[in-house]
Amino acid sequence: MLPAIEKVFRGLIKRQSLSLNDFAGIAVGFAAIIDSRTGRVLSTNGKYDDAKGMELAAWSRETFDLGLRIENDARMALLGESYGGAARGFSDVVMMTLGTGIGGVAMIEGKLLRGKHSQAGCLGGHLPVLFTGRPCTCGAIGCAEAEASGWALPGIVKDWPGASNSTLSKYANVGFKELFEQAAYGDAIATAIRDRCIAVWAADAVGLVHAYDPELIVIGGGVMESADVILPAIESHVQKHSWTPWGKVRVRAAELGNNAALLGAVPLLAEIF
């Protein structure tokens, strides 16, 4: 893996007519539990398992003579939204990313929550919302991700009563795009599954509010192409069911899309320079 990364990076530098002297450092967003202090990948949950245990910071210094920071990709996205997106100007924020999986990360008093073992505030998608629910890839039961994520959706549709009579049955591997489209066309099964997914996300959001006391929830990910349906429902549920005597938690859509984690590289690298 590392030789391939080096080849790609050097190729990018060459195409942009740059040199290593033009870089302050390297920032990497990775879908895993990360020890950002040492630059080690701690746990990957079946994704890129060969990265586990790699000393990327030491490799970067040896290969490029550049400092490297690696961080959980959802945390990187929150840093980006805080630096120049929907969370700019807020110090206490939770961000949910809804897509293939569910990310849930937290910033408290302007700093990412990491914790003693580097996994605080980055496993929001693995809060249990139904203890008798579906098995999750993490080993738990009824996690929000197991109940309403992209990887879980085909199984949810398959097990849904009457799904064979739904237009969803024509898709070999149904995704949220197809689900929301068919719900908009009036398919009753698609509508029921869509509404249940939104309810799961809303319940997860309330759990994150109670855990981290944010003033703002930012919601991003590919599913937010349907923000006009998702955002009002989650906001209504959060404001109705969150125990926040100080006032109401704001709920906003992410603004930066796939560029959020890229922009998050700026404040992440600023932590070491």
Regions found by a protein language model. Name each.
Residues 68-72:
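General beta-strand structural signal in soluble alpha/beta enzymes
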